[in-house]
Amino acid sequence: MTTTCRALLVDASFPAKKTRGWYYNLAIAKAANWFRAQGADVSFATPKTFSSDGSFDVAFVSAIFSWHVQGALQTAEWLKESGARVEVGGPGFFALTSMARSRGFDAQMQPDPRFDRTPGAYDAVFWSRGCPAYNCALGYPKDGSEPVCLVPKMEGSRSTLYDDVTPAPMILDNNLSALPRRHQELIVERTLAAGFKKVDCNSGFEPASFKPETAMLWRTLPLVAWRFAYDEIAERKAVLKVIGILDEIGVKRRKISIYSIAGNEPVEACEQRVREIREWKCIPIVQRRRPLDYLGGPLPTIHDWTERKLIDFQRWGNRLSYAMPFSAYDPKLNHSGVKAMGSGHGR
């Protein structure tokens, strides 16, 4: 690659409108550094802002979520027609590689070996890849169904450890508490030395592998929250164990954020999990179950769920579950549980 090479990086999952959540495409940031190291001039775009006027030699189109894959492929086709050499990739393609192949692209759905190990200072970091949580039915379903979590198949069921990364305030590792003790110490020591005012372990810890010594180690960082999941009723005992450990070291319950997927169990079980999180004075983070090949449109559901019920349940769980049972929820209620003026009654 010469210094005249022009590279375009397209983030197909970039939010179409501003959201209150945090968003960062680490793959795009690493790809930019890799292309620059090859001497390329790098430009960035989204499917709505890119140009297919033939001004780029190479292009990489990334999709984090499966429902952005069709837009990513359309963008890739336009760029290919303009004469650019185009690659597509990202976790969104995990269950959709055959779709990409049918349209002429060999999708890189696992961490790209060129980009993943590219050094640099990023807003987020992986100190490890993989997840050995064999007890998790989302990544390791026992009934032969397709997994809802892609991490074990995409990154491996064993942890791959990295010790040559630059610390960042957002830690993305999928299962920190299952990492070898020495590697956890390395992460904490280097992150602490970086002097960040706040640190977020975004994917968090696994209840089954969380121990008192885990809490004692990670409490030395200025964590914005202690994050872990309560995704199945069967995890209740392990979740309570973690809460008890955090109580022992003085962590306030409001600093505990518990992920809770909705739609993987019947409504009654999912509601029980959310209401228990509220009863424990912790913060629920309710997420809707989506198949890994979900392309958008009507959402396939199982058990006694409908898409409308899932949407309502997520809003109830995150905003109003402290005030009422799900049966009393009305979409017309505001965040304080007050019905807007002039609205009707009932659901």
Language model features with spans:
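Anion (oxyanion) recognition and catalysis
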Residues: R36, K80, L192, D247, ...
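Core AdoMet radical
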Residues: L9, V58-S66, G90, Y140-V242, ...
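Canonical Radical SAM [4Fe-4S] cluster-binding loop centered on the CxxxCxxC motif
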Residues: R20-A27, W34, T118-D163
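A structural motif corresponding to the C-terminal lobe/cap of the Radical SAM core domain
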Residues: L217-R227, E232-R347
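Short catalytic/ligand-binding loop motif for oxyanion handling, primarily in non-cytosolic enzymes
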Residues: K17-K18, H68-Q70, F94-S98, A133-C136, ...
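A short acidic, amphipathic alpha-helical/loop segment
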Residues: G71-W78, M99-A100, L186-R190, E213-L217, ...
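Catalytic core of nucleotide-activated saccharide and alditol-phosphate transferases
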Residues: K80-Y140
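A short, structured N-terminal alpha-helical element that caps or precedes a catalytic domain
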Residues: M1-S98
